[in-house]
Each structure stands twice: as C-alpha cells, then as structure tokens.
From Swiss-Prot:
One of its GO terms (molecular function) is N-succinylarginine dihydrolase activity. This is N-succinylarginine dihydrolase 2. It comes from Caulobacter vibrioides (strain ATCC 19089 / CIP 103742 / CB 15) (Caulobacter crescentus). The keyword Hydrolase applies. Its EC number is 3.5.3.23. The active site is at residues 175, 246, 367.
Amino acid sequence: MISAFEANCDGLVGPTHSYVGLSPGNLASTRNAGEVSNPRGAALEGLAKMRRLADLGLPQFVLPPHERPAVSLLRQLGFSGPDEIVLTSAWRDAPALAAAACSASPMWAANAATVTPSADAADGRVHFTPANLLTNLHRSLEGRQTARSLRRLFADETRFAVHDPLPAQPHFADEGAANHVRLCAEHGGPGVNLFVWGREAWSHWDGRFPARQTKEAFEAIQRRHGAARAVFPQQGKAAIEGGAFHNDVVCVGTRECLFFHERAFEDRATMAREVRAAASGLFEPAFVEVTEADLPMADLVASYLFNSQLLVVPGEDRLVLLAPVETRDNPRAYAVAESLATSNGPIGRVEYVDVRQSMRNGGGPACLRLRVVLTEAELAAANPAQRFTADLQDALADWITRRYRDRLSPADLADAKLLTESREALDELTQILGLGDDFYPFQRTA
C-alpha cells in the first residue's frame, strides 16, 4: 500500500471578516448579526490553529482569501462608475447586495470543494470539484475563484484534476466537503466515500431552513471523479431543522471511525449497513454515536462538538479530536467529549482550540479546513510556497498585523478605504504565497 497523509488546506480569513447575518439556517450567523468583528484577530486565530496541526506533524497548507468586496458582482447588478462609487452606491441603494459582496465566507474551506483521493479515483489522480454554493448569494460567488486557487496549489495535471463547479442550478446545489466523509483502514488504501445529501432535486422540501445539498449533485461528482465505494445517506431532517446546515455540524469521520449524533442521518440503520457493505474486505467501520439524551441538538449547535477535526497524529495509537473551546465551555458537550478519552473507542484524547471569531459566524475548526489525502509524490507536487511552516507563519502574522483592521462593524464595510486596503493586502499576499501577479480579478484588470 502506498503511504499517504491527510493534509489540511485551511482558508485564510480575509480582511472583510464581519457579522452581517447572511446565512439562513446558520443560527450563530443570525444571532451575531450586527456585532463588531475583529478581522485581525480572526486571521491570527486561524494561523494558530494551522500551527497546532503542523506541530502535530500533519501536512498543512494555506488557501488565500478571495477578493472582497466583489465589485464585479455589483457591476453585474447594474451599479456603475469607479469601483469606490460602485461600492458606496450599492450600500446606499441595495445594502443586502453590498453585504453579500463583502463577505469573507471563503475562509470556510470545508465548502471549497469535494475531494476524491487518487486511491479511490478511477484514473489514479486526486480530483476536486469546487462547490457552486448556490443556496446563498454571498457564497455563490466563490466557485470560479476557488477553482483558480486549487489549480495554483495543485497545478500538476498528471497528478491532480481540478474540475469546474457543477452547473449553478438548484437541482445541483452543492456545498462541498462539509457533506462528505471518507473512511478507510489507511489513508493510502481504498476508502468508502459517504456523500451526505439533504434533499432530492425533484422532491418538495418544506423545511424551516434550506437543505443545501442535493443528492443529484453528489451523484454527478461521484461519476465525474470515478469515486469508488460510494454511499449516499440522507442527512437527518431534524438536524437541518435544528441548525445543522451542513452534515459536518453533526458528524465527523476519519480512518475507520465515524463519530456522529443520532440525528445526523435520516436512516441511521441503512447508513451503517451500506457503509459496512462498502467496507467489506477492507476494514470494519467503528461507529461512535452520541444520543440526543446525552447531547440535545441545542447544546450540539451551541458547542459545535462535531465540527471538530478528527486527526490521525503520528506516534499516537488512537485518534485526536480537535474541538472548539465552545465544546469545553458547554457542560453537556464537554462531558461527552471527555468520555471519549476514557472509553476504549477509537478516539483517545481531545484538544481544544480557540476560533471564536469564526464560531460567531457558525464555523468551527472543521469548517476552516479542506481535507486532501495525498501521497508523498502528490505532497511534493503541491505549491511549496503555500505549505505551512514556521517561516510562513511569521510572514503571514506580520502581514496580517500590518494590513488587517482589528475592529470592523457592518457599517464599516461601506468605507471605500476598505476596498483599497483589501486589494493592497491581497496583492502583497500573492507574493508571499507564490500565486503570481494575475491571481485576483483586480490584478488582471489593472
């Protein structure tokens, strides 16, 4: 079996990180709308998490923010004039559109794409399909730039295939890896791919909150990637209604372990049976289920226990769960988390990480990263300038401290100076990460 590693590609928080409540069904986003954010603090929190993963011996990469404000969107919607006038006019006449154009949501890289490792793909390459994220306007802007970003990081087409997003049409609504789990005996060996969907394209959905992922989208991605051993369980309707807008709010898995809440799947028994059948002859899945009695949905969503990173750490026999500090601060979630370590199950210990700025918008540690299983050769073929090191951390921390504001209210997003500040910051970042001088739209039109 070829040796492989689960690399984490974390989204770097952008200069316009803010709380404007753009995401129906995301309870934290709605609750904190209107609050003052700290983009500098948020970006530094993200760096600290990346450093912890790197210190544990895990491959770590940095994905750049997207250009925001997205003036091109506002121009498409009828605003004209110099960029600064476009922005101020949009805030005056259509503030909801302007807010969407300013969102720093690409930081949540779990939604960047769905990934199939070379061990599972029909042609032996690593496949990526950037998510179209069409359920919410602010996120629907991301797919094309995400594809560009992934093609810079994984440029070798003999090893990597970065596809275009699926058609931007409701039948193919796709939210990326936040709804995908891969189980396996070893990262380099064959795995079972769980594509978790919320609704079928031709079925009526009458939920209070949107079901963002269609089954048809994941079926198309599975065909496109040639992903072997695919299972298509439905996400629990009760979970979506309770605020689990992606499956990674109620479920996380790696290697043989699937750690999930009892409401994560609409039909838990069928899911388990199909996963076992797909894994037959390869490995025995380990299902670690938490009941509603032990952790009610309200505490689950408040604590984000399952929006943790489940890690295979070199030198450790059991898995490590990297959870947000909100899990530690919630008595019921903390009791569940700590019970994992004292059990004889696959999860041996829990660490806690502070990503509060992201959490206030409904994004825990798992939201901030895209997992990519890579062999040694594939790892070596990735853009080395984006590989997280102590030197890169120092360079990015200096850049963030110089370029980012430490206070940003929703009203501040209308400041034309923020547009200039953001572009100057991103222009410098392209040099730090070796992205070239044509990475962002403003660079290509200068």
